[in-house]
């Protein structure tokens, strides 16, 4: 089954969280919807501290890394991407 763009971005972010290696190599392998995935990944990298600040207001302790990656994808879309509808950010992530 084909992964959606948000799932691909979450996997790349998960790898970045786990390995601390910059995600450019994984982004180079993305074929479908590359611009959207790139915006998500680089935006999350750029706004990591802001995302963590927002998330810690609602989550008392740090979730597991794969959940944190998905959370970053959803929160980034809701807070920093004007061209993404809220229902899409929540439902698809």
Task: Please tell me what each predicted stretch does.
Residues 1-93:
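Class I Rossmann-like S-adenosyl-L-methionine
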């Amino acid at each position: 089954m084909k992964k959606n763009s948000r799932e691909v971005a979450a996997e790349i972010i998960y790898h970045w969280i786990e390995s601390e290696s910059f995600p450019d190599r994984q982004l180079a392998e993305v074929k479908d919807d590359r611009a959207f995935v790139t915006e998500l990944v680089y935006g999350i990298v750029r706004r990591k501290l802001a995302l963590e600040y927002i998330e810690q207001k609602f989550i008392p302790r740090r979730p597991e890394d794969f959940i944190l990656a998905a959370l970053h994808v959803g929160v980034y879309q809701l807070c920093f991407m004007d061209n993404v509808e809220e229902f899409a950010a929540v439902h698809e992530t």
